[in-house]
C-alpha cells in the first residue's frame, strides 16, 4: 500500500479487536516507523514499549479501560524523555505527535487498525500508575497508547469536510 492510500484509509478504531496475534516483526516495523519521525533539534527523545501479547497488555487495560485496550492483542506505548532537550526547548508534543502519526500510517499499511489514545495520560494519577507499571526511568512521561490489531468488523469512520474547502492556494 502506498503512503497516499494509507493516509486515506487510516481511521481511529474505537471498537473491539479480533484476538488474532500481530507478529512481532510487524510490531517492530511499526515501532521503527515511529522512531524514523523527525524530532525537534534531533533530540530523538521518543521511547517506545512494545506490548506483544494480551497477557502483557492486560494490567495496562485495567488502568486505561476502553474497548480497544480491553480487546487488542497488542499495543505500543509511547513515552518522551524530558532529560533530552533541544537547545533548552521542549519539543515533546511535536516529537510524539510525529512518531504517533507515522506509526498509525504503518499500522494501516500493514492491514491493522489502531486509535491514538492520549487523554488518560493527562491525569497525574494515571500517569503515576503507568510509569510504575512500566518501571519507567525518572524523566519519562507516557503520552500515547496505540492498541493494535485486526478490527472486529468495520470500524465507524467520521466524515471529513471536502479537502477543497480546507486548503487554499496563495491566499484565502
Put a short name on every predicted segment.
Residues 1-172:
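Acidic, surface-exposed loops and disordered segments
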